[in-house]
């Protein structure tokens, strides 16, 4: 991990010229990373760290700050926006912003996940989406132990625990726990 050991070699110079690098001094690539043609790595908003053995399929767009864990895969056409952390051995596609994916979780297909926490070993079926903003722009309230709690946040998506699954076309409401 580059945050723990800054003396590791950055393999960014081995990236194919068909990959678009924006603010490349803020892009850090580990060993044996594959980045296919047409990928955009935009670190103008913060660093992008891609750990060892990750695989980025063609035409994915990744904006920093972002961390992609060891042996994870970012699928073709994915849009990974700012403030995303993806653990090791994950498969992520579709649109993702301001979210955390813990290790071994999958969201391979189309759909939106935003302002969310995805536990370990979670599988989100094709076209799973979450809302992260109420239509009236009010603060989000969630239910915990049969009690309504005001989060104080205008944006809050899905919080899904370890080993959870969703089927295809699942829609999660704003602030779903």
Over which residues does each language-model region extend?
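Terminal amphipathic alpha-helical/low-complexity segments used for targeting or macromolecular assembly
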Residues: 1-26, 32
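Flexible, glycine/small-residue-enriched loop-and-beta-strand segment within the central core
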Residues: 24, 35-161, 166-174
